[in-house]
Amino acid sequence: MKVFYNEAYTAAAHAFDTTRKSGEIATAMDEGCAPGCEVVDPIDFVDLAEELIEATHAPAYVEALRTGEPYDLAGSQGFSWDEGIWDMAVNSTAGVVAAVDEALATGGSSGSLSSGLHHARRAGGVGYCTVNGLAMAATRATELVSGTVVILDLDAHCGGGTNELIGGDGRILHLDLSTSSFDSYSPDGDDELTVLHGPSD
């Protein structure tokens, strides 16, 4: 199984588990902890990822991610902007898109060591999520297959950013099972949100 990753996933200077864990996991995989998995660089999908980010997120936010200005918008996901943020966002998105393309091309499994996705909204980052590669990859998948694309989000927090970006798109079914009400939302259409521990979390 191909699992996509490159060092740009960890290009952000802010040292935090969301910005670092993919590198540690890739190293462990390279050392044989996941037999049958091959770590693959998504470099061939970087140009497409840039196009998808520009099509999905507001122009002012994209420019802030590239330049750091305005500073508050550039760091809206919760950590300080630096020049590595844009590379991280683009390459992490490239990995998710590459994994979708690989799975559809082979009919098998594929993955990406991307993180920090489902809280990001059109106009800014939220909850340590910079851009929403999850919504972008699902939208990309609708261009490659007929039928319904399913997002199964099992993160502890709700994916309110994903809902904002793809909620109501009849080609995508968003199923969100969470243990915390952080970033909760009212699902659209057939989408579902279940929070296991109630609204006080």
Feature map (PLM): residue ranges:
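Metal-dependent C-N hydrolase catalytic cores
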Residues: M1-A138, G147, D201
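Conserved alpha-helical scaffold segments that buttress catalytic/binding sites
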Residues: V97, D101, G111-D201
